[in-house]
Design a protein with these regions (language model features):
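Aromatic- and Lys/Arg-enriched surface recognition patch
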Residues: 75-96
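GIY-YIG nuclease catalytic motif and its immediate N-terminal context
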Residues: 1-82, 103-123
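Structured alpha-helical
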Residues: 100
Length: 123
């Protein structure tokens, strides 16, 4: 499992484009993600998405801290707890994948990206 950085161009009308990246899972599948700073992350961004908490080493290489999925029902306390935990673990970025068709596909993506951990798969 590894990150593959993507080059982005300016958005429409010259606005900055959302930083994009991709993660390659154990299966070889690639998952494109939007990159968000962990500090000001909005909990609503986690709804119906796969979220990868990331920290970078001194050379800029991404290290996955945790990966989880969240369904559409609001579970703000659990989401906030997960966010607090990954921030304390050094996560500075949250990579959000929104292209999964439903909860089963999001769970499969988490399994594909997951490393051996006791972290919950869903928050």
């Amino acid at each position: 499992v590894r990150e593959e950085r993507l080059k982005t161009t300016a958005g429409l009308r010259g606005t900055p484009a959302l930083p994009l990246s991709a993660w390659r899972g154990h299966s070889g599948r690639r998952y494109v993600v939007g990159v968000h700073p962990a500090g000001g992350f909005d909990l609503d961004e986690m709804a119906e998405a796969v979220v990868i908490a990331v920290r970078r080493d001194d050379t800029g290489i991404a290290e996955m801290v945790s990966v989880a999925t969240s369904n559409e029902s609001p579970r703000d306390h659990l989401r906030r707890t997960w966010l607090d935990r990954v921030r304390r673990s050094g996560a500075t970025e949250l990579h959000v994948h929104r292209l999964a068709e439903g909860e089963a596909e999001r769970a499969a993506i988490v399994s594909d990206l997951r490393f051996d951990t006791i972290e919950p798969a869903q928050v």
